[in-house]
A protein has these predicted regions:
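Amphipathic alpha-helical dimerization/coiled-coil segments
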Residues: 1-6, 23-27, 75-98
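Alpha-helical residues within the helix-turn-helix
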Residues: 38, 49, 55-56
Length: 98
């Protein structure tokens, strides 16, 4: 995973509302915008905005099924992100560390 992808995912998950939305989607098979609105107590426009950012970070994918758009977590993204962070953290140690 390249540095720009790591940064994009980090920024997407840095917002507490987005993190909660991602957590809810990850724990379910799929969710609609309406289900997220009901659960989180935010407006549909706000949910749509957050879903777009999560989707652009490739954390979720959204698919239209009839009149609903279902969102689900992209398998493997968080695992790859965790490995990339571990690789960064396991790099050269700073001269300031003891």
């Amino acid at each position: 995973m390249d540095r720009s992808r790591i940064e994009k995912i980090s920024k997407a998950l840095a917002d507490k509302t987005r993190l909660k939305i991602f957590e809810a989607i990850s724990r379910s098979e799929k969710m609609t915008c309406g289900e997220i609105v009901s659960m989180r107590g935010v407006t549909p426009a706000t949910v749509s905005h957050h879903l777009k950012i999560l989707s652009e970070a490739a954390l979720i994918e959204c698919r239209r099924q009839g009149q609903f758009v279902h969102s689900k977590a992209v398998p493997g993204t968080i695992e790859a992100y965790s490995r990339a962070l571990a690789k960064i953290a396991g790099g050269k140690k700073s001269a300031h560390r003891k």
